[in-house]
Curated annotation (Swiss-Prot):
<dbReference type="InterPro" id="IPR001623">
    <property type="entry name" value="DnaJ_domain"/>
</dbReference>
<comment type="similarity">
    <text>Belongs to the DnaJ family.</text>
</comment>
<comment type="function">
    <text>May function together with HSC70 chaperone to assist protein folding and prevent protein aggregation during salt stress in the chloroplast. Involved in root development. Required for the position-dependent cell fate determination during root hair development.</text>
</comment>
<keyword id="KW-0346">Stress response</keyword>
<dbReference type="Pfam" id="PF00226">
    <property type="entry name" value="DnaJ"/>
</dbReference>
<feature type="region of interest" description="Disordered">
    <location>
        <begin position="346"/>
        <end position="385"/>
    </location>
</feature>
<keyword id="KW-0934">Plastid</keyword>
<feature type="compositionally biased region" description="Low complexity">
    <location>
        <begin position="350"/>
        <end position="362"/>
    </location>
</feature>
<feature type="transit peptide" description="Chloroplast">
    <location>
        <begin position="1"/>
        <end position="38"/>
    </location>
</feature>
<feature type="compositionally biased region" description="Basic and acidic residues">
    <location>
        <begin position="370"/>
        <end position="384"/>
    </location>
</feature>
<feature type="domain" description="J">
    <location>
        <begin position="50"/>
        <end position="113"/>
    </location>
</feature>
<keyword id="KW-0809">Transit peptide</keyword>
<dbReference type="InterPro" id="IPR036869">
    <property type="entry name" value="J_dom_sf"/>
</dbReference>
<dbReference type="GO" id="GO:0009507">
    <property type="term" value="C:chloroplast"/>
</dbReference>
<keyword id="KW-0143">Chaperone</keyword>
<dbReference type="Pfam" id="PF13370">
    <property type="entry name" value="Fer4_13"/>
</dbReference>
<keyword id="KW-0150">Chloroplast</keyword>
Length: 465
């Protein structure tokens, strides 16, 4: 790791002893005002943490803002106020302030953090595709999404392996070796821009991660298609990315007791930083003198006063991790989600009709539906429709039987005249017309009664919720 350069002239009076272990050496640089601490052991460094987040400032803060944040935290972390844990916290604060107040050290720290930012979110596993092939297979299919024009040919030839993501309309491998090798080769040969490649299995995860960072736009089929603006070539950067990731992993695995002390001190400072944030907020009430002097330090605990902005970020990250975990467990069920189009077999054009009509050259893409995709709301709606059909039919059948039963006793007596005219007289005297009219009438009456009951039930449920 690049050693940090500190200036002894900016060292606060509280740090009478330099925070290096006995196994560390002080190496003097030519300038008498600057020296650096090189660790000869595997002890951790303050640069492993986000110092801007630690001080509660932005990365664009100037030197005066850094100094104000440092002084505000140092007042709360002083050993006379915070007790014994305040000693470690004061050391961490001094190191952070010295690093960020020096322009050269801050620039080197920002560059190091930018390198670590490139690795943020990378887990060493593929993001989009799942492995469906044999474990002995060392090849994998990969789509250069920046180069892809969204022709759908790969998804039509090997529909289990390739899919079209709905955000930009580009092809993507969602299941490795889910189709026979012959179909995958056919899909590679059918690509008009040669954006599908066979890569090493060990390079699949970093390639997909680097591809997710590339800017993309919606594809436009036609002459002069600008499919995307590439920032860098992922095939060239994959080896460098793997080297940086291996170096970062080897550094993070070397944890010592000094790192445990630093982590505890950093978390305590963060709790104080959050406390100061809430105390200075115009939307919060002023704290009492008792709470003003209260500082409870617990090892490996988070902030006492939570920061809503940080909490929202954590919740969003947890939801994203949970969603990605569920999607990986589904395997080839990627094709069932709403993020991809799944082309139907009927849309596959015939080989002898390549120069056909416009309709055949633009196959429609449909989404497969499965019974497992049916939502609980749709099942409740189906049961509701079944009840609507069942109850009115029952009332109509009962009415038909009652009218027929009454008509059997009045068969001998018929009316000779009716106020409604001849049509009404024929209906009254005809038993079959009476039965039909009674069935239709009571069917609608039953349907209206059912709607009324359901409306009352929904109103009661809304009041309960």
């Amino acid at each position: 790791m690049t050693p940090a350069i500190f200036s002894p002239t900016t060292l606060p009076p509280s740090t009478a002893t330099w925070p290096c272990s006995t196994s560390q050496k002080l190496i003097t640089v030519r300038s008498p005002l600057k020296f650096k601490c090189r660790a000869t052991s595997s002890s951790s460094s303050i640069t492993d943490f986000d110092l801007y987040d630690l001080l509660g400032i932005d990365r664009s803060s100037d030197k005066s803002q850094i100094k104000s944040a440092y002084r505000a935290l140092q007042k709360r972390c002083h050993p006379d106020i915070a007790g014994d844990p305040g000693h470690d916290m004061a050391i961490i604060l001094n190191e952070a302030y010295q690093l960020l107040s020096d322009p050269i050290s801050r620039q080197a720290y920002d560059k190091e953090q930018a390198k670590l930012e490139e690795l943020r979110g990378y887990t060493g596993k593929p993001i989009y595709s799942v492995w469906c092939g044999p474990e002995t297979e060392q090849r994998a299919a990969f789509v250069d999404e920046v180069k892809c024009v969204g022709c759908l040919k790969c998804a039509l030839c090997a529909e289990k392996t390739f899919a079209i993501e709905t955000a930009y309309g580009r092809a993507r491998v969602v299941a490795q070796w889910a189709d026979p090798e012959s179909k995958i080769k056919e899909a590679i040969e059918a690509c008009p821009v040669d954006c599908i490649s066979m890569v090493e299995r060990s390079d699949l995860a970093p390639l997909e991660f680097l591809m997710s960072k590339q800017p993309r736009g919606n594809v436009r089929i036609g002459v002069g298609n600008t499919v995307g603006e590439r920032v860098s070539n992922v095939f060239v950067d994959v080896k460098k990315f793997q080297e940086r990731y291996a170096k970062a992993m080897s550094r993070t695995t070397k944890e010592t007791s000094q790192r445990e002390v630093q982590i505890s001190a950093v978390e305590a400072i963060r709790s104080i930083s959050n406390w100061l944030y809430w105390r200075s907020s115009p939307y919060t009430k002023p704290l009492s003198p008792e709470s003003n002097m209260s500082l409870t330090f617990t090892k490996r605990k988070k902030a006492v006063d939570p920061d809503i902005r940080k909490l929202q970020d954590v919740v969003a990250a947890m939801k994203q991790a949970d969603q990605s975990g569920r999607t990986k467990e589904k395997g080839s069920a990627y094709l069932l989600g709403e993020d991809y189009w799944s082309p139907s077999n009927a849309a596959l054009p015939s080989s002898g009709n390549n120069n056909g009509s416009k309709a055949s050259s633009n196959p429609q893409v449909t989404r497969k539906t499965f019974p497992s995709e049916e939502k609980p709301t749709s099942r409740r709606e189906n049961r509701r429709q079944f009840r609507i059909k069942k109850f009115p039919i029952g009332t109509a059948i009962v009415a038909v039987f009652l009218v027929q039963y009454q008509a059997s006793y009045r068969a001998a007596s018929e009316l000779n005249d009716h106020i409604g005219g001849s049509l009404a007289l024929s209906i009254v005297n005809s038993p079959w017309q009476q039965i039909l009219l009674a069935g239709v009438t009571w069917y609608f009456i039953g349907a209206m009664l059912l709607q009324l009951v359901e409306a009352v039930q929904h109103k009661l449920e809304d009041k309960e919720t």
